[in-house]
Amino acid sequence: MIKKSILLVDDDQRLRELLKDYLNEKNFQVFTSEDFDEAKEILGFFIFDLIILDRMMPTGDGINLIQDIKKVSKTPIIMLTAMSENNDKIDGLKTGTDDYLSKPFEPEELFLRINNLLKLYENVNNTELLFSFGNFIYNTKTNL
């Protein structure tokens, strides 16, 4: 089974290490970045199944990075941040983040949110492979 890949962007080194270890144990391949500039560089070379990012970091606001990502990709994004006010959550969701989780959080909750998003996006991607013509449905992946 191929491991799903996650890019984790957060300036908190301890949190990055803990989440990387936890998600590796859950059978994910996790790449980390400590700032948005590094994350943009990584995203220029690799495609990830999911991105987790902090909103406020020394190099900028995660909202801007989300907007850049969503212009070119359908990759699901979870915003993981200490900004927990309702208007912060609404701003994040308006810009295209797929889920919003406030710190502090339970790792299992993050794991469940990741799985739910990956299942949802997998189903969406699978339906894009189907074409119908009259009473016939053609699957472009299996050619059936």
Q: What is each model feature region?
A:
Residues 16, 58, 85, 103:
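The feature encodes the CheY-like receiver
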Residues 54, 81:
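Active-site residues of response regulator receiver
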